[in-house]
Amino acid sequence: MKKYLIANISKSQYLLIKKLLNMRFRIIFDFNLKKGNYISSKSSESYNSNIDRYHDIRQYLFKNLEITNRKLDFLEIGSGAGDMKYLLQQIDSGISHKGFAEENLKLFNTKFNYYGLDINFSDKSKNIFFGDICDDSFQKKYISKYPVPDIVYSNNVFEHLKNPWKAAKNIVDISKEGTSIIITAPFSLRYHKSPNDYFRFTHEGLIALFSEFCDLEILINGYDTNMRRVNWQGDDDGSFVKEDKFGAWRENWFSVLVAKIKNKKL
């Protein structure tokens, strides 16, 4: 099993360490910048690049949503097994936080009824059903069986959709005015198919997907750059992707949109 050393070092230090370790470690190094940080200067661009997506989304769901006298219906697009391991902080930056996850799950279950949609998985006991969010007849199939969602959540799924604008239309179609949509998707990330990898989105791109079908009340929009300097090289068990022609990748930006649907146009 390979081990990793992440260091902020000079080239001469790197060569010395490499020799001393006798290649037992793969060294992920950054000659000039510390892991997790980067040098930035003032920019004329007005986007927010200080989002911590899972923390900020939890804050919105658990603290900022209006208090109601009923549990809210929460639909996850691309749910997999429905464990929401990143949102609930079971895994954060590759580190397991079991205690946090259990607390977050307990809080989640007091506030929400969970429903999941996945193209490869279903489990009636967890309210997870087969479905293609890009299907032209999705609305008809959905509304005949499931409640109108109060929240629609999708974590790093839209880049894998061949027709993400159809997904946006279907989300608006099954929702009501006031439904919260929470979308995260990569702006800059290496190629990773699951089963395919089609798109990257700017913060404005996520808004544009929905703008033809509804107006949005924007609550959070911008980028999570906390993983910007992490090098997902691959080639080890549990790696993000296998090694490919890109080699190292050090520009991991994720676009985030939290908004409420207003003035449906259909």
Name each region found by the language model.
Residues 43-54, 157-160, 164, 199, ...:
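Aromatic-acidic/polar surface patches that form glycan- and anion
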Residues 54-63, 99-101, 114, 243:
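Short alpha-helical segments and helix-capping/turn motifs at coil-helix boundaries
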Residues 15-69:
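Class I SAM-dependent methyltransferase Rossmann-like catalytic core
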Residues 22, 26, 162-176, 180-266:
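S-adenosyl-L-methionine-dependent methyltransferase catalytic module, highlighting the catalytic core
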Residues 69-192, 203-207, 259:
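Conserved SAM-binding loop
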Residues 63-67, 105-107, 247-249:
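A general structural signal for short secondary-structure junctions and capping/turn motifs
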